Amino acid sequence: MTFYERTVDLGLRAYKLTLSPLIGRQCRFTPSCSEYTAAALKDHGPLKGSWLGLRRICRCNPFGGSGYDPPPPRHQPRKWKCEE
């Protein structure tokens, strides 16, 4: 596990131990918004991962839907027809 991934895990653990008990389980999605953001940060890096996490938190409201919503997969480079 890299230093960056450990830092993300530490931040998620700190959130779950301090703020989450005060707020309660209110996320309408699976995985929860904090788990989604941690996975997005690990998969996509700090800039795109933060953007994806912020978008997810904005969708987590009574009018934003609910259910299973995993982070998008990391973009794979396109293969050219001649490489197949």
Swiss-Prot record:
* Pfam families hit by this protein: YidD
| A cellular component term, taken from the record's GO annotations | plasma membrane
Basic residues: which segments have biased composition?
75-84
Q: Keywords in UniProt for this one?
A: Cell inner membrane, Cell membrane, Membrane
Q: Where in the cell is it found?
A: Cell inner membrane
InterPro entries hit by this protein: Membr_insert_effic_factor_YidD (IPR002696)
The record gives the membrane topology as: Peripheral membrane protein
Instruction: Show the stretches that span the lipid bilayer.
Output: none
Q: Where is this region: Disordered?
A: 64-84
Family, similarity comment = Belongs to the UPF0161 family.
Query: Its function?
Result: Could be involved in insertion of integral membrane proteins into the membrane.
* The protein, known as: Putative membrane protein insertion efficiency factor
The organism of origin for this protein:
Caulobacter vibrioides (strain NA1000 / CB15N)
